[in-house]
């Protein structure tokens, strides 16, 4: 009887330890999925923003769309910064957070220009906005490795 209880206790302890590991794996996969989604959003923004900025000079609809995208990218960056990365992704997360600070500031500057009707492709290209967006998308390869 003691042997059976010992075996059951051992199995219970192993199962409990395995659950913690499983939670860590799930947390890592969830983070990877959220980070990849964020990076994809930033990539799409970086691709579309220059054309929208060019059109926004003479097109109210394009200006409104650019403003909406700028606000959306600011919110997405803030939401990403609030994620809790797994230990394996802590350095990558900090790198993206650093880029996010500049991205958010640049988005705010371009948003003000758009609201004042002063946005242009040249202004956008001279801002850190698109450059930081591209730097964030460059981190995608590192994020994909976390999911493996």
Curated annotation (Swiss-Prot):
Residues 1-18 form the signal peptide. A lipid is attached at residue 19 (S-diacylglycerol cysteine). A lipid is attached at residue 19 (N-palmitoyl cysteine). Keywords: Cell membrane, Lipoprotein, Membrane, Palmitate, Signal. Pfam families: DUF6376. This is Uncharacterized lipoprotein YybP. InterPro entries: DUF6376 (IPR045956). The gene is yybP. GO terms for cellular component: plasma membrane. The keyword Endoplasmic reticulum does not apply. It is a lipid-anchor. Disulfide bonds: none annotated. It comes from the Bacteria. It is found in: Cell membrane.
